């Protein structure tokens, strides 16, 4: 199997999903724009849901690798926060457009719903370990248990899906995760009361 064609399909899907969201993009369109046949598509992916998942996992793995690298470098909280901001901007520019985020919210595909839920849980486990390490290094306030930070992140995700929150961000859905990240990072860097 030619993994180059798989990557061409994934790159094309990422671009189209960013431009239009994944709901509006068909397998036919991905194949047409990638100049790859449908049988070739199905060698690598068993449908649109599978390529959505592959593209999201690829993005997640890249972000996680960079966060693990910055953690290994024992940087300052400021450099770590800068990395978070940069990765968030890159993710918005590469995949998580307003259209893509709306499709995630409006998704009715059970396989994708389960996938996004599992991905979210995996994110929380990773971030718990990440913030625990920062706390052990003295980079975030020692008086706040890492478990509380984890609960804050979980509740921030819930807040992001609340009907009361969504209208405020309907014109700029990417702004909500930015505001949540800003609140989290600036709150962690503050002095104890």
Language-model-detected regions and their locations in the chain:
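Hydrophobic/aromatic-rich alpha-helical bundle segments in the mid-to-C-terminal region
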Residues: 102-106, 135-181, 193
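Hydrophobic alpha-helical connector segments
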Residues: 54, 68-94, 150-153
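Alpha-helical DNA-contacting segments of helix-turn-helix folds
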Residues: 51-59
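C-terminal effector-binding regulatory domain of bacterial HTH transcription factors
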Residues: 187-193
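Short secondary-structure transition hinges
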Residues: 89-128
């Amino acid at each position: 199997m030619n993994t180059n064609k798989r990557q061409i399909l994934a790159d094309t899907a990422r671009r189209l999903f960013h431009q239009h969201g994944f709901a509006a993009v068909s397998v036919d369109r991905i194949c047409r724009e990638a100049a790859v046949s449908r049988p070739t598509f199905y060698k690598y992916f068993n449908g649109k849901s599978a390529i959505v998942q592959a593209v999201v996992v690829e993005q997640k793995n890249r972000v996680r690798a960079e966060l693990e690298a910055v953690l290994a470098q024992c940087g300052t909280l400021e450099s770590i926060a800068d990395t978070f901001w940069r990765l968030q901007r890159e993710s918005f520019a590469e995949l998580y457009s307003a259209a893509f985020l709306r499709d995630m919210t409006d998704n009715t595909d059970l396989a994708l719903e389960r996938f996004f839920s599992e991905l979210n849980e995996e994110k929380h486990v990773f971030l718990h370990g990440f913030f625990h390490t920062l706390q052990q290094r003295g980079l975030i306030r020692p008086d706040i248990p890492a478990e509380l930070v984890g609960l804050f992140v979980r509740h921030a995700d819930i807040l992001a899906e609340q009907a009361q929150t969504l209208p405020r961000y309907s014109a700029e859905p990417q702004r909500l995760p930015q505001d949540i990240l800003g609140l989290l990072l600036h709150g962690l860097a503050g002095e104890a009361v």
